[in-house]
UniProtKB/Swiss-Prot annotation:
Chain location of the short sequence motif 'KMSKS' region per the record: 638-642
Localization in the cell: Cytoplasm
Primary location class: cytoplasm
PANTHER family, per the entry: LEUCINE--TRNA LIGASE, CYTOPLASMIC, LEUCYL-TRNA SYNTHETASE
This protein's record includes keyword Membrane: no
UniProt keyword Lipid biosynthesis present: no
Protein name, as recorded: Leucine--tRNA ligase
Catalytic activity entry: tRNA(Leu) + L-leucine + ATP = L-leucyl-tRNA(Leu) + AMP + diphosphate
Amino acid sequence: MSELARFFIELGEKWQKRWAEARVYEPAPTLGVPKFFITAAYPYPNGAIHIGHGRTYLIADVLARFHRHLGRAVLFPMAFHYTGTPILTIAEAIAAGDETVVEEYMAIYGVPEEEMRKMGDPLYLARYFHEQSKRAMQKFGLSIDWTREFTTIDPEYQRFIQWQFEKLRKKGLIVRGRHPVGWCPRHSMPVGAHDTKDDKEPDIGEWTLIYFADRDGLIFPAATLRPETVLGVTNMWINPEGEYVVAEYDGRKMVLSRDAAYRLSFQGSVKVLREAKGREFVGREVQNPVTGEWVPIYGAKFVDPKVGTGVVMSVPAHAPYDYAALRDIGAIRLIPLIKVEGYGEYPAKDVVERMEIKSQTDPALEEATKEVYSAEYARGVMREDVVELVGRHLPEPARSMVMAVFKMYFAGRPVREAREFISKWLAEAGLGGVMYDIMNKPVYCRCGTEIVVKVLEDQWFINYGEPRWKELAKKLVEEMTIVPPEAKAQFFATIDWLDKRACARTRGLGTPLPWSHGWVIESLSDSTIYMAYYAVIKGIRRHNLRPEQLTEEFWDYVFLGVGTPEEVSAKTGIPAEALRAIREEFEFWYPLDSRNSGKDLIPNHLTFFIFNHVAIFPREKWPRQIVANGWVLREGEKMSKSKRNVLPLDKAVEMYGPDPLRATLAISAEVEQDLDFRHAEAVRNAQQLMSIYTLAQRLAQSAEDREPTWLDRWLLSEVALALERVRDAYEKVRVRQAAVELLYNIKNIFDSYMTAVERPSRLAVEVAKAWAVALEPIAPHLAEEVWSLLGGEGFVTSAKWPQLKPDPAALLARRYVDMVVEDVKKIPAYGEGVRRVVLYINPNFTWVKAALNNDVKSAIAAGTPPQLAKRLVELVRTLGDEVRSLIAAVENFDEREALLSYKNYVEKALGAPVEVYTAEDPAAPDLGGKKKAALPLKPGIFIER
């Protein structure tokens, strides 16, 4: 541990103890006081929280602390998510003696060997990391109200979740039925993002299976995402070296890759009859079930047996890979199906030739495929003459009937409509089917098993596909603030594709499903409205309510205002006054003002949060804001246990101290960006914070009582402007922007001031105290120390936001002085050996104000000599918007007073003594005839060497 880190750790411990003793972060509802209620995602205690969690919690804490300075009652609570399989899976691995897991936990999290032996018990493991994570949050300086802490397996919480689920069921939003889900074969249970390694959400997609059959009736099911192109098939592909099987699948005998047979076994009945190499089937002919044409099966090593069924249909007119492969073997036959503006009859051929692709192994084929598929899906229309390809093997009138159907629903239709039609038609005609797959595979369960798709028959689902519910969810997204704003599109997209989602399991920790024995509500379903529970749990404990008293009537009254306290009291035995108090506390805190989490939770938790709020609460209780931050890398690499580069939050605090760590997580990237945490940056920020502390010490020791000078007023004004920018940044959740202003820009302003004055003034101390208030959300421990050092009363965490007002004249004075220094340095005579600089000022500021409108006549009318008016107007025109606006805001400006105030500063900048005269003063010497050169804001300059 470095001395710098030790200093900040001790500072943190000092102020954390004082905050806890004063209970400053335990707010009570206060009539007439505005509130701000913010939450961040509660962690799974299956391991210690790391700096990625720390970033999310820091952003929430910054907002919480900022809103306290605005005079609001701020509630920032925290809890722990015990539900589901993450804890159970790790505990099982430890109990089974999994050396990798044991080694990781000892190396990364520093778990002692004697503790590891106890962690085969999932509840022991959860409580261990629960307490470790809580300590880390406290050491990190989070302003959390710990009186509302809970776990998701507390009996009171379980009653709350059961109430929520009964509400959803009564609204028809929980259903039971057949649906594909991500599935862990080892544990025989559905999985979501929080059950997988790296929290990867299984993306379930749908292949259309098209049944091509050989002359013996053996089916070769081609798996495709583009079933509308089946009319253009000229051959089939199979990997000759691949492992295949002949199997019975749902009563049909077919050829599948061995991997596909395994995956399909979770979706239907699969009976493997025999195994075979792919080469056995190369050379056979199969019949296209739509056109009746017989096409050959070719061998191709590019076919991946793990994708789809391992049987691929070839459409060279519209698939660049197929075109290139068939060109290589000299077997191209093209059947045009889709018209796309900007392409000829054969889009695949056009793109392959335009991109000069030489063979089927050319990497550019990937880009070519994306281009063709995207263009055809977005703008493509099926050709009218494709009808002639349909049903050539069928007798009349069957063929005419099928052609009529295709003419009506397929020919001339946009590709997306044709695709939907033919998928349904193939299934209904018994010529095809559906295969579900993990499209972003491989995805692994936390136990290490690869996830598959299983079609469940009697599973409980939350039906996020319900159209009216989707519309309500979209309405909330439209109304609420989303940070970053561009994430709104992702929320809308997620709402569109969400469908039924398995909400209960037969395994894991959590809340029992109230109406179906043996089912446990899963972790992404019991964590959607728990923010409301924070608002009432303190009251539940204060009034010593028992879990069995927390009935439907209790929750209906507290959250929805159904019934009266007296009616609910009669049914629950809870005193009416207690009910009224709990209801009033909920009414005070809700709705939630900000929900903070990582951007990876947009496709699941954050969208479920939206859905469940609109389903259960009235509109006035819908949440107001979501903040979704980017990921955290470490030294340019993704953190992972396998790389041993995960940095637990408590270790990071020990390495750098809380405030340097907070500053680094705040300043290294804007909220929506991924943040690369670097050691060198953390050390640099620690040094910068230390320099702020040293500055505060100097101010406390050397400040003097005196009338404020131009320099003092400039300091106040510059910091006032900076604090306006900081406030705007905080309000817009631009945390990095605020941190840059606070740690570096304002420090530079103070450094410039301290260089220019012999001793700082008491006004400078007051300005530094204002800085400490604004700095507090990012570096609260240092801010408290600075505030205390400078004589601030109470805690800075409770101080009101500073009300500094910039003085335009003081700002103009500094801009003017810097312009003069720059003008002197541009003169050829300036350089080494200068003995003195003499400045002649023209005191007629009214001329400058008249010149602002860029009109020479106006300047002359204001008294400007005609021979100077044009020069003055041109000068003012070049000053820039900021200086011009300051001139407009200032009634009168004394250049001589400004220069004399900044005399030390100017002399240091020029490296020579400086004398200042008024050009109109007849007693002043006219050195070099420079008096007549003086214009307002542009002195005459004489340099003596």
